[in-house]
Amino acid sequence: MFEFEIKSNCSNTEARTGIFHTPNGQVNTPRFMPVGTLATVKGISSEQLISTGSEMILSNTFHLHLQPGEKLVKESGGIHKFMNWDKPILTDSGGYQVFSLAKLNNISDKGVEFRNPRDGSHVFLSPEKVMQIQMDLGSDVAMAFDHCPPHTANENDIEDSLERTHSWLQKCVETHQKSNQALFGIVQGGKYPRLREHSAKFTSSFDLPGIAVGGVSVGEAVEEIHSVINNVPKFLPINKPRYLMGIGSLREISLAVAKGFDIFDCVLPTRLGRHGTAFFNDERWNIRNARFKNDFSPIDKTCKCETCKSYSRAYLHHLVRNDEILGLTLISLHNISHLIRFTNAISAAIKDNCFTIDFAPWKRSSIAHHTW
């Protein structure tokens, strides 16, 4: 039911194209996943999302458990029916949110007790509970519950959290019983290569349908992000999809693909879109700026998204300067389309054997310009 089929390999790098087969359709890789935390990509309908070329989205177990609750989603027919999205869905376990958003009361090998950030009530999440929530939600891919410490933690604290993550993974594997849902483990270990290697080998030993690398891009220096991207893949199985969590910049996606990663997610395209910032090649444009007031060209004349086909920079400038919701939706649509287009161009370049680690297909001098 879940299979990762490698279709082509790059001769210059570790990049590959593939197809991840799921019960709700296939995901062509490399692939960017938009983030729909509460079963919605903010400000965008499922129909609009399809127009961007999105093939898989991410929702969050932590937030959906708090509101509206997994039982209601299950009663509706599952998360796909609940949000009217018939393509694959991955649910993050909520580990990162528990440790970054909630006021912790107690943490043990059994789980985490914390205060609900919505109403202050006490909530307890264990690996077993997180698995049950995700099984009730009915996503295609469930993520194991992990302990994601702050990037400022020292090596001893990160090692302690890593052992907890590994213990929880064992419990997740024992609890997860849904044949039409894949379970992915998560590699942790912070900025320490020894711990990352240990975690990658331990997580890989379970032979799960896929494997993720977490605790990346959580405030650490870019050199530390690149160290993880460069070093962890060598300890991961080749025949499984590799998911690098929380990465959405073109530079990091290109580097990660070159090192053999396949799937990415990030809130960046919609978060920036809601603030009036649009992607153009490898730049970010603040559409509120006065220079766009009389500019009647699209954001990007080479882009085929619904926004660029129908609306000018001047119109978008007018919308965002007047805080019209439509403007934020249209820019978010373009930003998501831009990242999907980028990963599509990477795929084409890998197949044509012209992908490079500094992939920039918008440059006319690039040998991969034809993919853009």
UniProtKB/Swiss-Prot annotation:
Substrate binds at D92, S93, G94, G95, Y96, D146, Q188, G215. Its cofactor is Zn(2+). Keywords: Glycosyltransferase, Metal-binding, Queuosine biosynthesis, Transferase, tRNA processing, Zinc. Pathway: tRNA modification; tRNA-queuosine biosynthesis. Residues 246-252, 270-274 are annotated as: RNA binding. GO terms for molecular function: metal ion binding; tRNA-guanosine(34) queuine transglycosylase activity. GO terms for biological process: queuosine biosynthetic process; tRNA wobble guanine modification; tRNA-guanine transglycosylation. Binds 1 zinc ion per subunit. Zn(2+) binds at C303, C305, C308, H334. The active site is at D92, D265. Its EC number is 2.4.2.29. The keyword Coiled coil does not apply. GO terms for cellular component: cytosol. The keyword tRNA processing applies. SUPFAM superfamilies: tRNA-guanine transglycosylase. It catalyses: 7-aminomethyl-7-carbaguanine + guanosine(34) in tRNA = 7-aminomethyl-7-carbaguanosine(34) in tRNA + guanine. NCBIfam families: Q_tRNA_tgt, tgt_general. HAMAP family: Q_tRNA_Tgt. Homodimer. Within each dimer, one monomer is responsible for RNA recognition and catalysis, while the other monomer binds to the replacement base PreQ1. Belongs to the queuine tRNA-ribosyltransferase family. Catalyzes the base-exchange of a guanine (G) residue with the queuine precursor 7-aminomethyl-7-deazaguanine (PreQ1) at position 34 (anticodon wobble position) in tRNAs with GU(N) anticodons (tRNA-Asp, -Asn, -His and -Tyr). Catalysis occurs through a double-displacement mechanism. The nucleophile active site attacks the C1' of nucleotide 34 to detach the guanine base from the RNA, forming a covalent enzyme-RNA intermediate. The proton acceptor active site deprotonates the incoming PreQ1, allowing a nucleophilic attack on the C1' of the ribose to form the product. This is Queuine tRNA-ribosyltransferase.
